[in-house]
A protein has these predicted regions:
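Targeting-peptide/extracellular-domain and disordered-appendage signature
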Residues: 1-124
Length: 124
């Protein structure tokens, strides 16, 4: 990454999402998916993080098979994918969970012990 690159962050309000929210509570149709994607970088530009929350995990071989067998309930294939980038190595983790691990509300998405929370000031 060049030191000339300037990273800009925005809050949901600045992005125009405050009125409509992030859609955490919206249902996902059978065989469908919904995801939320966030990138971040360190001030020095050498380290990064990507966070992807899924309802209907597009990377899941289990969801792929279930969809092709006519049993593709998106809520039964939820996951949180975290990737850490660095100058020497990158690491990632993803755990797929079933529908009992999913809790949804307009302000919050829980996947097992992990959660995303939407505030006017940002995402936590």
């Amino acid at each position: 990454m060049s030191s000339a690159v300037t990273m800009r962050s925005t809050t949901p309000v600045e992005a125009g999402l405050a009125a409509s929210g992030l859609g955490f509570e919206r249902p996902v149709p059978e065989g469908g998916y919904r995801w939320w994607y966030v990138d971040g970088f360190s001030d020095c530009g050498q380290f990064g993080v990507t966070l992807i929350a899924f309802i209907g995990s597009v990377f899941s071989p289990y969801y792929y098979r279930a969809r092709h067998r006519g049993r593709g309930q998106a809520a039964n294939h939820v996951s949180l994918n975290v990737i850490l980038y660095g100058p020497s190595k990158s690491r990632w983790c993803m755990t797929e969970r079933g529908d009992t691990a999913l809790q949804q509300s307009p302000e919050r998405l829980d996947i097992g012990p992990s959660a995303l929370r939407a505030y006017d000031s940002g995402l936590e």
